[in-house]
Amino acid sequence: MKEKIHPEMKLVTVKCACGAEHKFYTTLENVRIDVCSNCHPLYKGMSGASLVIDSEGRIEKFRRKYKDQQY
């Protein structure tokens, strides 16, 4: 490998919104994530059908819009 052309890898702490911290080697400085293996529903044993994340009421908006439609 050529000298001084590759980015420097360093050990950083990745912080999740749930409060969990993981350590990784990366070229980035600070890493913050929304979902990790500690709080993701599929890692927690929940099925995707049993958990719906609806942060802005989109499901209710959809149901109101199409409630009179026949399928």
UniProtKB/Swiss-Prot annotation:
Keywords: Metal-binding, Ribonucleoprotein, Ribosomal protein, RNA-binding, rRNA-binding, Zinc
Pfam families (UniProt xref): Ribosomal_L31 (PF01197)
One GO-annotated biological process of the protein: translation
Cofactor note: Binds 1 zinc ion per subunit.
GO cellular component terms, semicolon-separated: ribonucleoprotein complex; ribosome
Keyword Metal-binding: yes
Entry binding sites for Zn(2+): C16, C18, C36, C39
A molecular function (GO) term: metal ion binding
InterPro entries: Ribosomal_bL28/bL31-like_sf, Ribosomal_bL31, Ribosomal_bL31_A, Ribosomal_bL31_sf
Listed cofactors: Zn(2+)
Domain of life, source organism: Bacteria
NCBIfam families xrefs: L31, PRK00019.1
Protein family according to the UniProt entry: Belongs to the bacterial ribosomal protein bL31 family. Type A subfamily.
Subunit-structure text: Part of the 50S ribosomal subunit.
Protein role: Binds the 23S rRNA.
Protein name: Large ribosomal subunit protein bL31
UniProt organism field: Pseudothermotoga lettingae (strain ATCC BAA-301 / DSM 14385 / NBRC 107922 / TMO)
Lineage, broadest ranks: Bacteria, Thermotogati, Thermotogota, Thermotogae, Thermotogales
